[in-house]
């Protein structure tokens, strides 16, 4: 049986390059989510445009896993860089994923941890290593580390300071990965997050995001395509 790879991006711009490469495509639209099933370079894929934010991401990921049954999930798209050695267009790869806007510490949980869930969601090690290998082959600067998710666009020093107080190893922030990881954890489906930096999360990050989202989409898609070639 051929493997099927699930790929998730929040916005149309983040999956456009991948969608245009697909052949034998069928489209399913449900509850605001779009799922494209087909092939990229002879690899079976189910490509989800989930919508922005953790609720949309969780809903879309659940639909993707239930309806198309992928063997693994790659979350792609853009992220805001927090590591000092990251620039726009660089790649971030998850070694763990956490919610930064969850607090149930009153009941003894870690900051960012939801009841009945681990504090950190761990990606599949083989997928992490594959992503790192492909970034090296492509000559792209990549940082592997903690990616944190929350339902806000991080834009300013005060927000960054608050996140770093709790998650001092964070390399990037965005708005969907922890929800995707949580659903994959519940379904026992391996995942990895491979995103490109569209902005450095400072007070001007919203301007950088608008300007460099196409570049981030291009760079992240490049690595995802290279990863898919390992399965064809």
UniProtKB/Swiss-Prot annotation:
The active site is at 14 (proton acceptor), 199 (proton donor). Substrate binds at residues 80, 154, 175-176. CDD domains: MTAN. Pfam families: PNP_UDP_1 (PF01048). One of its GO terms (biological process) is L-methionine salvage from methylthioadenosine. The keyword Amino-acid biosynthesis applies. It catalyses: S-adenosyl-L-homocysteine + H2O = S-(5-deoxy-D-ribos-5-yl)-L-homocysteine + adenine; S-methyl-5'-thioadenosine + H2O = 5-(methylsulfanyl)-D-ribose + adenine; 5'-deoxyadenosine + H2O = 5-deoxy-D-ribose + adenine. Pathway: Amino-acid biosynthesis; L-methionine biosynthesis via salvage pathway; S-methyl-5-thio-alpha-D-ribose 1-phosphate from S-methyl-5'-thioadenosine (hydrolase route): step 1/2. Its EC number is 3.2.2.9. GO terms for molecular function: adenosylhomocysteine nucleosidase activity; methylthioadenosine nucleosidase activity. InterPro entries: MTA_SAH_Nsdase (IPR010049), Nucleoside_phosphorylase_d (IPR000845), Nucleoside_phosphorylase_sf (IPR035994). GO terms for cellular component: cytosol. Coiled coil: none annotated. Keywords: Amino-acid biosynthesis, Hydrolase, Methionine biosynthesis. It is an enzyme of class 3 (hydrolase). NCBIfam families: MTA_SAH-Nsdase, PRK05584.1. Belongs to the PNP/UDP phosphorylase family. MtnN subfamily. Catalyzes the irreversible cleavage of the glycosidic bond in both 5'-methylthioadenosine (MTA) and S-adenosylhomocysteine (SAH/AdoHcy) to adenine and the corresponding thioribose, 5'-methylthioribose and S-ribosylhomocysteine, respectively. Also cleaves 5'-deoxyadenosine, a toxic by-product of radical S-adenosylmethionine (SAM) enzymes, into 5-deoxyribose and adenine. This is 5'-methylthioadenosine/S-adenosylhomocysteine nucleosidase. It comes from Haemophilus ducreyi (strain 35000HP / ATCC 700724). The gene is mtnN.
């Amino acid at each position: 049986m051929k493997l099927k790879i699930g790929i998730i991006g929040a916005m149309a711009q983040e999956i456009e390059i991948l969608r245009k490469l697909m052949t034998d495509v069928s489209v399913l639209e449900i509850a605001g989510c779009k799922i494209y099933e087909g092939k990229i370079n002879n690899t079976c894929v189910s490509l989800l445009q989930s919508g922005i934010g953790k609720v949309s991401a969780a809903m879309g990921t659940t639909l993707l896993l239930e309806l198309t049954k992928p063997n693994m999930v790659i979350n792609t798209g853009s992220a805001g860089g927090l590591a000092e050695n990251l620039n726009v267009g660089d790649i971030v790869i998850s070694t763990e994923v956490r919610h930064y806007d969850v607090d149930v510490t009153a009941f003894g949980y870690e900051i960012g941890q939801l009841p009945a869930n681990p504090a950190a969601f761990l990606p599949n090690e083989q997928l992490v290593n594959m992503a790192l290998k492909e970034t090296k082959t492509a000559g792209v600067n990549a940082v592997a580390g903690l990616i944190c998710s929350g339902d806000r666009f991080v834009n300013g020093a005060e927000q960054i300071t608050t996140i770093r107080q709790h998650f001092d190893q964070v390399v990037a922030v965005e708005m969907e990965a922890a929800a995707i990881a949580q659903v994959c954890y519940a379904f026992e489906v391996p995942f990895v997050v491979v995103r490109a930096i569209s902005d450095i999360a400072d007070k001007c990050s919203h301007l950088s995001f608008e300007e460099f989202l196409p570049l981030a989409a291009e760079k992240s898609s490049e690595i995802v395509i290279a990863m898919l070639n390992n399965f064809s």
